[in-house]
A protein has these predicted regions:
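C-terminal-most transmembrane helix of multi-pass membrane proteins
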Residues: 2-7, 49, 208, 244-295
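Hydrophobic transmembrane alpha-helices of multi-pass small-molecule transport proteins
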Residues: 77-80, 107, 121-140, 157, ...
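Transmembrane alpha-helices of multi-pass small-molecule transport proteins
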Residues: 14, 37-84, 112, 160-164, ...
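Glycine-/small-residue-enriched transmembrane alpha-helix faces in small-molecule transporters
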Residues: 1-43, 77-80, 84-88, 131, ...
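Specific alpha-helical transmembrane segments that line the substrate/conduction pathway
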Residues: 43-53, 82, 89-120, 157, ...
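Membrane-interface interhelical linkers
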Residues: 1-23, 53-77, 118-124, 142-146, ...
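Helix-helix packing/entry segments at the starts of transmembrane helices
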Residues: 47, 101-104, 167-188, 220-256
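Hydrophobic/aromatic residues within transmembrane alpha-helices
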Residues: 35, 44, 48, 92, ...
Length: 295
């Protein structure tokens, strides 16, 4: 008689974990943005990745695994993509509201999903994504036009996110999350020279260290752990569908913590990109469901 409540709880639990993870990531982004006046986006990215790599090395101890040359190459590319994604996203946050930056960045994984499917319905999702981009990107009008450099940084972060997905799948095929830990180390080494050159001794400012540690936990250690638990309890495509609402979390985080007000047009643009991402994921699930049933 208790089967249905247990089934409902088993469904809601991983969803709750993902919602907490998304809230954690965007809260970390808001806190990171408050550090920019002190050490800049470059220094903030550097400290976040350094602390995150230390945390993940201590917890996962990836040096215990042996990797082939091919896997190690994939880990290095994966780590560079991760570093580029974090760096460019934080550079975008200097002039672009968090919600819009996340939506622009989300075009990376959306493109990977669409181009890997190539079903007729995907043209609808492409059109929705393009419509969202056209609403968000500067169009020469006054008032709420986005900074073009910031928008370019966010789109660049999306490209890095796409590479992160492609090479992350290859790097993680043999050693899973241990590869992710090594990737974070590579990302830290990749970005550190830029952050040190920009911020210098300001990186050691006493007030900055605890904030950077909090950002590393909120944006990396905690959400990674929660997402890993959730992935063991729900299908990967359901996971992808739920993650599609992350731009909305970014917009809400910017509103609550930084007072970033978005226009109705910008909210509609974010909604269009979210809808395109959800639609793509659901279309992929329908396309693969016969094969799953056959197994």
């Amino acid at each position: 008689m208790n089967t249905q409540p247990r089934s409902l709880a088993a469904t809601l639990f991983p969803i709750g974990l993902l919602l907490i993870a998304m809230a954690s990531i965007q809260s970390g982004a808001s806190l990171a943005k408050s550090m920019f006046p002190i050490i800049g986006a470059q220094g903030t990215t550097t400290l976040r990745l350094i602390f995150a790599s230390i945390i993940m090395l201590l917890i996962l101890r990836p040096w215990r695994v042996r990797m082939t040359t091919n896997t190690l190459r994939n880990v290095v590319i994966y780590g560079m993509a991760l570093g580029g994604m974090n760096f460019l996203f934080y550079m975008a946050l200097q002039t672009v509201p968090i919600g819009i930056a996340v939506a622009l960045e989300f075009t990376g994984p959306l493109a990977v999903a669409i181009f890997s499917s190539r079903r007729p319905i995907d043209f609808l999702w492409i059109a929705l994504a393009i419509a969202g981009l056209l609403l968000l990107l500067p169009a020469g009008h006054s008032g709420q036009a986005l900074d073009p450099v910031g928008a370019a940084y966010a789109l660049g972060a999306g490209v890095c996110w796409a590479l992160y997905i492609l090479f992350g799948q290859r790097a993680g095929a043999e050693h899973g999350i241990q590869s992710a830990a090594l990737g974070v180390v590579v990302a830290a080494l990749f970005v550190a020279p830029i952050g040190i050159a920009h911020a210098g001794s300001a990186l050691l400012t006493p007030a900055v260290i605890p904030m950077a540690l909090a950002v590393a936990i909120l944006s990396t250690a905690l959400p990674y752990s929660l997402e890993m638990v959730a992935l063991t309890r729900i299908p990967a495509r359901t996971f992808g569908t739920l993650m599609s609402i992350e731009p909305a979390f970014g917009a809400l985080s910017g509103l609550l913590f930084l007072g970033e007000m978005l226009t109705l047009t910008q909210w509609l643009a974010i909604l269009a990109i979210i809808t395109a991402s959800v639609g793509t994921t659901l279309s992929m699930r329908k396309a693969t469901s016969p094969a799953i049933a056959a197994d």
